[in-house]
Amino acid sequence: MSMTGLLQDVVQTLVFRQAPANGKIGSFAVRDTFNDKFDGRSLAVAAFGLLEEMRQQGYGNLISPTFAKRLDGYLNTLGADQLEFYLYYQMQKKTKAYPVNLQLVRQIQAEHPNNIAVQAMSFALLAKGGKADEVFAQAQSLQELFDQAFAQGKYFDHKLIDLKGLQAYYLQGLLSLYTRNTADKKEVEKLIVAQIVSLLKSRSAYGLWSWSETTNYLVLEALNYALDQYYIHQSQATKCVLKV
């Protein structure tokens, strides 16, 4: 079976297995917590992610301005002592009304080189707007962190986003980087293939092998994104051939 067929099969199978009663994958950003307990921060980030999805889909007029303002005020308190939550909050931003402070993200990334969660989320954010050569160097360093973590058996079970969830963010960042003009495109492609293969190996008879539904959703999202980019690439290649 080709990689395309394999990806399609996996995504369709996991959509069925992970789907709630209404038969669809929910777009609710968070369904668990970082520490396997109820946490107001994760709930707030979840609410923000849902509101951003509503804004992006054209339903922003249904959002209570008062609630949105109070939520923004709370989320703006996430700072240096809560780096992972801060970056996770940044990952939910989708509209122009909520731009990501890439300078601050870059600073956080530089100050915490061995924190794989910080590195994965900052990479996914910077891959869209950071300098391509710097982002590629970060991608290589991040791959080394993942290799070390998997070799040591560190999966961060019972966390909101375990190692596979972070790897899904890594894949999304690589796909974003691949769409940009970079001299390292072939190397980026190799890293993309490696992440896809690794994530596909995470399947079990019951879907993705993770305690966290949020992680499962992130992996599905990343694999869907990979499929989208593949079809876009194939479409562009076909157009070039037809022109010739």
Predicted features by range, described:
Residues 1-244:
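Preference for long, amphipathic alpha-helical scaffolds in soluble/luminal domains
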